Amino acid sequence: MGSGTRETTTQEGALRRLFSFPNPVNEVSARLVAAAVVVMCVLAIAFDLEWMTVLLAYGFVARVLTGPTLSPLGQLVTRVITPRLGVRERPVAGPPKRFAQGIGAAFSLTALVLAGLGHWTAAEVFLALLALAALLESAFALCLGCKAFAVLMRVGVVPDEVCERCTNIWATTPGAAA
């Protein structure tokens, strides 16, 4: 019975590691992923690539659930692109980034459902909003989801324990904790 318990514990640990989100997050990688999201959204809108919504939605859901682990884009950025840039890591708090990925998942899943129902123009609106938010993140380190997370912390919806590093998010330099 002892080895079965050990095996179960090992499996639980593996699942816990799989379904974890990095904390801290390298802001350089986060901004590169955001830049790729901008490109994907713009291509989808410009060329009516409805199938691109599947890739976007999968990517956001994968990143919310597992960080970059099950996200092909996350893997490409964290394992290939960022290391080759030769720039210093810029660690920022993980929970606000995960929350932002969740908002991206909601927008991309909405676009996917709308596209699937034949409402491509409505889907394009959600893709355009997603592209705008990703552009702000990638170009200016302005993470709208992170700012929303900070507001939710400030009003007590998100407890301080969720992200102790975030408790003074407004006083930090842009992008440092958001």
Task: Please give the residue ranges for each predicted region.
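Membrane-interfacial helix-loop segments of redox and metal-homeostasis proteins
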Residues: 1-178
